Amino acid sequence: MEKKEEQYINQAEYVPHPTKEGEYALFLHETYHLLSEDDETQTTE
């Protein structure tokens, strides 16, 4: 499953959240996923 997540991350773009500071919105085509603190630790590289 990890491979699929990596593909999503590669296709997605990180942008600053319009309402919450420090939060990043993960835009996947028309859908967006809000990354929580737990997700940030996984994508921190």
UniProtKB/Swiss-Prot annotation:
Q: What InterPro entries does its record include?
A: Tscrpt_reg_SplA
Q: Which organism is it from?
A: Bacillus subtilis (strain 168)
Pfam families recorded? SplA (PF11132)
Q: What is the name of the protein in this document?
A: Uncharacterized protein YkzD
**Which superkingdom heads the taxonomic lineage of this protein's source?**
Bacteria
- What broad taxonomic lineage does this protein's source fall under? Bacteria, Bacillati, Bacillota, Bacilli, Bacillales
